[in-house]
Each structure stands twice: as C-alpha cells, then as structure tokens.
Swiss-Prot record:
This is Small ribosomal subunit protein uS9. The keyword Transmembrane does not apply. It comes from the Archaea. The gene is rps9. Transmembrane segments: none annotated. GO terms for molecular function: RNA binding; structural constituent of ribosome. One of its GO terms (biological process) is maturation of SSU-rRNA from tricistronic rRNA transcript (SSU-rRNA, 5.8S rRNA, LSU-rRNA). Keywords: Ribonucleoprotein, Ribosomal protein. It comes from Thermoplasma volcanium (strain ATCC 51530 / DSM 4299 / JCM 9571 / NBRC 15438 / GSS1).
C-alpha cells in the first residue's frame, strides 16, 4: 500500500490526512505539528503518534484541515491521524488500544452546535415578556 487517505470531523472542522511511508514527519496545513501554536492542542494532535510508539516511527502524515475553530480543527486532525495510522498499518490491536484510550480517536464526535431559533438570541434563550 503506497498511501492512505482518511478523514476526521469535529463540529464544523473537517480534516483530511494522507499517510505514507517516510521519516515520521507530521504536518498540519503545511507546518510541522511540533510548531503548532497552542501546546495543549499540539499534545492532543500528537496523542495517536505517542500511543502508537514504534509502530508510527516510519510514517509521514500530511493533514489539511478546514472550517471550525482551533480546538475543533485539532480534534478533527487527531481523529484523521489515528484513523490513518490504523488503516495504513492494518493493525486491529492498535485500533482497540485507541478505542480504549479515547473513543473519539477512531469515531467522529458528532455533537454540533444547536441552531438558533426565532424569538430569541440563541438556540434556547427567548425574549422576555412583561405581561404589564
């Protein structure tokens, strides 16, 4: 298998990961994952690689992510990377490890924002009535 393309979604963010044999370089939108600006999110993105340990050493991952905010993009990237590693290595043991650690590594988190409805400022909030 030359390469594998996988996707991950979170809120309105969609990430597409291309996994192929290489030197263990992970890039997100053209920049190395090690240079991702927010440390908490950087650690979150690199979780699948850290869990896979030696199995992911010779794999290059290129992620393109669009939509959403920084946290949604990080979660989408993380899911795409984990799915890509599992699919590229065809390793069920690794998939089970990911699922036990955190199910959202393999399965998309389908929760989205509740849409705004008429008669108020948000999805649930309504304009006040005075009755006087």
């Amino acid at each position: 298998m030359d390469y594998v393309i996988t996707t991950g979604k979170r809120k309105t963010a969609v990430a597409r990961a291309v996994v192929k044999k290489g030197k263990g370089i992970i890039t997100i939108n053209g920049t190395p994952a090690e240079l991702y600006p927010v440390e908490v999110l950087r650690n979150k993105i690199l979780e699948p690689v850290k869990l896979a340990e030696d199995k992911a050493k010779g794999i290059d991952v290129t992620v393109k992510v669009k939509g959403g905010g920084v946290t949604g993009q990080a979660d989408a990237s993380r899911t795409a990377i984990a799915r890509g590693i599992v699919k590229f290595l065809q390793d069920n043991e690794l998939e089970n490890l990911f699922r036990q650690y955190d199910r959202t590594l393999i399965v998309n988190d389908v929760r989205i924002k509740l849409p705004k409805k008429p008669g108020g400022r948000g999805a649930r909030a309504k304009k006040q009535k005075s009755y006087r």
